[in-house]
Curated annotation (Swiss-Prot):
Domain of life: Bacteria
An example Gene Ontology molecular-function term: methenyltetrahydrofolate cyclohydrolase activity
Pfam families in the record: THF_DHG_CYH, THF_DHG_CYH_C
CDD domains xref list: NAD_bind_m-THF_DH_Cyclohyd
Biological role: Catalyzes the oxidation of 5,10-methylenetetrahydrofolate to 5,10-methenyltetrahydrofolate and then the hydrolysis of 5,10-methenyltetrahydrofolate to 10-formyltetrahydrofolate.
Cellular component per GO, a single term: cytosol
Protein name: Bifunctional protein FolD 1
Reactions performed catalytically: (6R)-5,10-methylene-5,6,7,8-tetrahydrofolate + NADP(+) = (6R)-5,10-methenyltetrahydrofolate + NADPH; (6R)-5,10-methenyltetrahydrofolate + H2O = (6R)-10-formyltetrahydrofolate + H(+)
HAMAP family: THF_DHG_CYH
Binding site for NADP(+): G166, R167, S168, I232
EC number: 1.5.1.5, 3.5.4.9
Source organism: Lactobacillus johnsonii (strain CNCM I-12250 / La1 / NCC 533)
Amino acid sequence: MTNIINGRQIAKQLNQETKTRVDKLKEEGIIPGIVVILVGDDPASVIYTRNKQKNAEKLGMKSILRKFPKDVSQAEVLQAIHHYNDDPTIHAILIQLPLPKHLNQTELIEAIAPEKDVDGFNSKNVGKLYNNEEGHYPVSCTSRGIMTLLHTYLDKIEGLNVTIVGRSILVSRPLQSLLINENATVTMVSLHTDNIDYYTKHADILVVAAGKPNLIKKDQVKPGATVIDVGINRMANHYLVGDVDFDDVKEVAKNITPVPGGVGPMTIATLMQQTVDLAEWNK
């Protein structure tokens, strides 16, 4: 029998734990604060930022949405980042991606103070993760959310073969480091990989983050595998589908995430979790 991984339910439990931590911080006079920087009016980005803001407010956090027009200058966004770096009531800064092409994404992310870099994309935090350093530092919220799902449904990760389809710096690469740090054997492939089926069919855990709807079919999946679908693709009929053909692959997978309702809710719940982490680590 296939387990449908209920990301919404696990996110709900995580949010309850986060709310308890927020209440405890408030007793100490600390209100966790997050600012989301949004450039332009891309419909998907607007929805994502509103969801993040609603979740933060629901958990009792301070939440600011800093909006800029799509033709904003690099200097204006940098000025805002520096302002929030210096604001003691803000513990977490997030830049909603993607950004317009005229903006230098790397420079903006590097401008965020590492101790407020809630998505873990600043090179100092990336380096700590890559080196498996001890201590406290944020990591990619989506990647950490995936790890939470895996820990919920699997007894162990150590020793398992993992294939990640996709090589993005936002999800795939930090997830690769998190898995390696738990002694998994990780292979990363892309749509340019020859004989991609060989790698997917040998995976105990298959993570698909390629941005191509219904890419993976059941004949590409090892029977009994755990399949994590990171893709979010809006089709012509307005339905959302993942990068995995869910109805097909669920016939062979032991555990599988749906789209929507799998990884997505975990990303936002983990963002809230890490905002509180930053408030606790830096109080």
